[in-house]
């Protein structure tokens, strides 16, 4: 089986892919944070109202909303301060321990992030959000096997409401590891569950392109580029390379014009102008 070190991508594709993995990481974390900002409460037999919350619930909830906002703005130390206050109110709060791990990861402190995730999993062993986020951290550390195990555990939970998110992360991680057959399978499943997601479509198209399935890759990248609010330099560059492989000169010209007009400072345009299509 092909391993990560033997996968050779064009230089610009490597740059675009690196940027996309980073952007995807932010998107995955922010998706999870939307849950953090919700009122913090344990499941009950009926709807939870404000009157059901304890003072500790409310204090922790306010702190978590503030922490999530600071994290999204890159104010990591301030976010940590708010998380500490949330944990004073509720010492075993799952959302706070998870968010602390995400902040440490963003600060470049993988050991502290790892410790926080392990703490969360000690308290909540089969929590799918924690398993997902820990899997993503392990993927960033190129710990492919353990990352895959966390994703699979998350997907195995019957109560999990976001399987397409984890299938996307799993597929991205498999692609980074050079396991393109497995990545194609995971991303195909993600697309079946969430066909409207541009992140799923563009990653699926990228893997299909790398697997030399150019017609299929064209179909999925066109879905993204057909929506101006979804297309970006990476998706246009991928489309251009696909059309070049398929020999459609008119489509290549169209993509190059769009790339030049919409993203004049992008590394993808620089790669195109330098003729670095297949380095």
List where the protein language model places each region.
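Terminal, low-structured helical/coil segments at or just beyond the last alpha-helical repeat
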Residues: 42-46, 50-51, 226-279
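Register position in tetratricopeptide repeats
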Residues: 72, 106-107, 140-141, 176, ...
């Amino acid at each position: 089986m092909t391993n990560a070190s033997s996968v050779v991508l064009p230089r610009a594709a490597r740059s675009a892919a690196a940027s996309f993995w980073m952007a995807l990481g932010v998107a995955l974390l922010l998706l999870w944070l939307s849950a953090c900002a919700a009122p913090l409460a344990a499941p009950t037999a009926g709807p939870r109202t404000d009157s059901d919350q304890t003072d500790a619930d409310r204090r922790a909830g306010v702190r978590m909303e503030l922490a999530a906002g600071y994290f999204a703005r890159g104010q990591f130390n301030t976010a940590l301060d708010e998380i500490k206050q949330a944990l004073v109110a509720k010492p075993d709060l799952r959302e706070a321990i998870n968010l602390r791990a995400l902040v440490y990861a963003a600060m470049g402190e993988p050991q502290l992030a790892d410790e926080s995730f392990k703490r969360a999993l000690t308290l909540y062993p089969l929590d799918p959000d924690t398993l997902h986020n820990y899997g993503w951290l392990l993927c960033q550390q190129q710990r492919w096997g353990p990352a895959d195990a966390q994703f699979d555990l998350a997907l195995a939970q019957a109560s999990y409401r976001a399987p397409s998110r984890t299938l996307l992360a799993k597929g991205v991680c498999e692609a980074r590891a050079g396991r393109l057959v497995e990545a194609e399978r995971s991303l195909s499943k993600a697309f079946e569950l969430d066909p409207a997601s541009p992140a799923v479509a563009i990653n699926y198209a990228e893997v299909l392109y790398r697997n030399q399935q150019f017609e299929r890759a064209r179909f999925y990248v066109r879905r993204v580029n057909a929506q101006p609010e979804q297309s970006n330099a990476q998706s246009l560059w991928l489309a251009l390379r696909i059309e070049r492989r398929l020999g459609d000169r008119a489509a290549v010209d169209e993509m190059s014009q769009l790339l030049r007009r919409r993203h004049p400072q992008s590394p993808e345009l620089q790669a195109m102008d330098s003729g670095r299509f297949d380095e």
